[in-house]
């Protein structure tokens, strides 16, 4: 089997690539910078996938990349912080999905897996967040882009297209080729104070568990929607976990949700006039203060998979951050650099 992966130099896509190669499958990545991608996989020492130059916003390069592939994982996506503009955000998250999926269907590829986001079906009532839940009509650009892509994918699914959609929560774990927003937020909390949003919480999925589930979907094919929000922790529980696994003594800051949502909106306004490298935004504050406990797909045990504990995930994530220099070792006395 040969799998095309978009976003293969991103956090999720790189782990899917590594697991597919470890299982003996051929992998091709659509990348914007071949030298950068090659250097990353060379450092891992696990083999270098086939690399082709292109971008998901360019349909011609997508069509070329899909030649002789029999499966595709679309993991390329953008966030407001990464893309820098709403226009670019929609080009990546909406046009990119359309280019990849339409081109795959034109080639009669019958194993198509798309990584979406829980935000597309977000509801502060967790019981209402299911695989059949209606789409959320977000007033925020990121949510709007994910919903627009979902409308397209669901219409194709209704016509019988072989598309599997996966909805992860916050993705965390070791070995990020870049420095994703989840890590920026974690670093900020460890160094600048950990805000406790009342009784709220968040769900985190270990990137390795998410990749394993995606690879299982590539193997099985078919069509469906699968929730993978991960392990739920209240903010107080998460602070306890971070202190337990790292030895870092966090400064815990009680915070009211409505105030944080206001700060998020103000930060977004400031981004129109200056560059702000911060995980704070209207969208992130909404999710941080209103996130419920959402059930994971029931497919995990039938596929022989189980989620890691939050302790294991954050221990490995923080150890990796120390290893690559995102955190100083003195901040995490219980952790040593991984072998």
Regions found by a protein language model. Give the residues of each.
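Conserved Rossmann-fold NAD(P)-dependent oxidoreductase catalytic core, especially the SDR/UDP-sugar
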Residues: 86-87, 92-142
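N-terminal Rossmann NAD(P)H-binding glycine-rich loop of SDR-like oxidoreductase domains
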Residues: 3-25
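NAD(P)H-binding glycine-rich loop region in Rossmannoid oxidoreductase-like domains
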Residues: 45, 49-95, 103
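Conserved catalytic-site region of short-chain dehydrogenase/reductase
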Residues: 81, 118-127, 171-180
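Short-chain dehydrogenase/reductase
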Residues: 90-94, 138-150, 170, 183, ...
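Mid/C-terminal beta-alpha module of Rossmann-like enzyme folds, strongest
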Residues: 213-279, 301, 308-339
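A conserved pocket-lining segment of Rossmann-fold NAD(P)-dependent short-chain dehydrogenase/reductase
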Residues: 185-205, 209, 213
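Conserved beta-loop-beta element that borders a ligand/cofactor-binding pocket
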Residues: 116, 151-174
């Amino acid at each position: 089997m040969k799998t095309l992966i978009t976003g293969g130099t991103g956090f999720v896509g790189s782990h899917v690539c590594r697991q597919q190669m470890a299982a003996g499958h051929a992998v091709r990545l659509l990348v914007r910078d071949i030298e950068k991608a090659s250097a990353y996989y060379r450092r891992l020492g696990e083999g270098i996938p086939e690399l082709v130059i292109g971008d998901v916003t360019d349909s011609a390069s997508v069509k070329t990349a899909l030649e002789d592939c029999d499966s595709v994982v679309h993991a390329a996506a953008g966030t407001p912080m990464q893309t820098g503009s709403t226009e670019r955000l929609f080009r990546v998250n909406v046009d990119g999905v359309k280019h990849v999926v339409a081109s795959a269907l034109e080639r009669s590829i019958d194993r198509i897996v798309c990584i979406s986001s829980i935000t597309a079906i977000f509801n502060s009532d967790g019981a209402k967040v299911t695989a059949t839940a209606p789409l959320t009509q977000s007033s925020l650009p990121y949510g709007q882009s994910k919903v627009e892509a979902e409308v397209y994918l669901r219409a194709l699914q209704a016509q019988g297209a072989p598309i599997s959609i996966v909805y992860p929560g916050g993705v965390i774990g070791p070995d990020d080729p870049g420095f994703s927003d989840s890590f920026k937020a974690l670093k900020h909390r460890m160094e600048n104070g950990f805000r406790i949003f009342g009784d709220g919480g968040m769900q985190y999925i270990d990137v390795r568990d998410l990749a394993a589930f995606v690879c299982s979907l590539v193997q099985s094919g078919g069509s469906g929607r699968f929730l993978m929000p991960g392990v739920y922790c209240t903010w107080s529980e998460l602070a306890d976990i971070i202190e337990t696994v790292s030895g870092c003594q966090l400064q815990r800051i009680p915070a009211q949700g409505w105030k944080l949502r206001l700060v998020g909106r103000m930060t977004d306004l400031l981004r129109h006039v200056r560059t702000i490298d911060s995980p704070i935004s209207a969208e992130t504050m909404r999710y941080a203060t209103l996130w419920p406990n959402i059930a994971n797909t029931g497919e995990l045990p039938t596929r022989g998979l189980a989620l890691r504990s939050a302790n294991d995930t954050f221990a490995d994530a923080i150890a990796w951050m120390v290893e690559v220099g995102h955190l100083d070792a003195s901040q995490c006395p219980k952790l040593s650099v991984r072998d």
